Amino acid sequence: MILGLVRPTAGDIRVLGKKMDGGSRLAVLRQVGSLIESPSYYGHLTGEENLRIVQTLRGVPEKNIREVLQIVRLDGQRGKRVAHYSLGMKQRLGLAAALLGYPKLLILDEPTNGLDPAGIQEMRELICSLPERFGMTVVVSSHLLSEIDQMADHVAIIREGELVFQDTLEALHGRSRHHLALRTTNNAVARDALREQSVPCQEEEGYLILPILSDEMAAQLTRLLAQRHLGVIRLEERQKSLEDIFLELTGKAASL
């Protein structure tokens, strides 16, 4: 919808403060660049020739071609036919095409999809450098939470078309509270002993879930459990992963 490819069934779309209607749609899109999954190219043409087609259609200066090829580190491969490009090079060429007009808003859909670890790292570094170098806003859509964790500073999570979370990445991590998971030879007795000491706990999948304790309090509780003749089978510090938080927010359970 942001790119004008799909019309909303209700309401309206505003991009860069302007409505995406018939009067301003093209003016808005001139300030937007996009890379949607795996872009298509003319394989018999070189990378530079492919970009020249886009440059002509967009009406931007020809010098932008050389500049964006340098930005995505393809200036040394500009005379090579795209049919002989690796997948990572093709993705970078797609990013170069999206950057040709130096947009205010850059939309990237699964930009690291199908890349090997080296290609993922290179694409990630390129994407992260763009806001500071060119003052543009970059929106990345990805199902790889680890990639978002390393690239984004603001996050939005959508469930079946509904926005269920929108805030800073730091705020999302804030939902991942550290806690202790305790398993003893008798959790029921241990739970009563902990509550006598005003330590909140709840049972979950065979473990007692406790807040993080000071060293002094942890030592005190260890002595208390020993006095009640309770053996500690396992005590570990846990933290919810981004995947756990995502599944909680979307209400989805993992499935094969």
Predicted feature residues:
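ABC transporter nucleotide-binding domains
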Residues: 1-140, 145-159, 165
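Residue-level marker of structural boundaries
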Residues: 34, 60, 74, 132, ...
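Short amphipathic alpha-helical interaction patches enriched in hydrophobic/aromatic residues
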Residues: 36-40, 176, 229
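Non-catalytic alpha-helical coupling and interface elements of nucleotide-dependent molecular machines
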Residues: 56-59, 153, 230, 251-255
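ABC transporter nucleotide-binding domain
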Residues: 124-212
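Short, charged/small-residue-rich alpha-helical element at the C-terminal edge
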Residues: 178-249, 256
